[in-house]
Amino acid sequence: MSDFDIYTSESDLSQLKDLIKQCGERLVIRKGECFLRAGEIGGKIAYIEQGGFKCVRKDSRGNERIFAFMFEDELIADYIPYRNKKPVLLDIQAMEDGVIYCTPIENLRSFFETEIDGDIYVRKFVETIAYQHLQRIVSVVCETPEERYIQLQKRVPDIFYRVNLKDIAAYIGVRPETLSRMRTSFLRKDSTENT
């Protein structure tokens, strides 16, 4: 299992998001800055108010491999490495200027320990992490790049306005030229269906 943690709005984590916004430090993040770097022992969690991030690592040939994208109203953290006292394996890097609310995970410990539903929130974290990692594994192993492209388009309709083609290509597992051909093909298909 990878070490990046992406908590989406699919699960009911609204109370936790509100808590992070209340007690977290509001930070302006510039394009290219890292929220976390591979090798760090982190222990941070953040709510994304504005902007987009990528979980990325370079392979042995120096090519960027993108594991995930995160956008507004999502949480990012290094919960699993932190709990296991392990270094982070991926960079979480801003793809555009943004605003996050960030707090050390340790600052939320009292909430988890005193809140009646605190254990439920931790369980939801872990379940959400596990399910998202499984989704990504299944996607990479079982889906074609075209299917991954369609799923990404559905999740983030404005992805091509926010993320460069090279990063999208790395995420779906193709070269940028192949992505351009795929995109052109899908656009032609859409225009043919709409006429």
Residue ranges and their predicted role:
Residues 66-123:
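Cyclic-nucleotide recognition modules
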Residues 1-30, 81:
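Cyclic nucleotide-binding regulatory module and flanking cytosolic helices
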Residues 25, 34, 52-57, 75, ...:
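Short beta-strand segments in beta-sandwich/barrel cores
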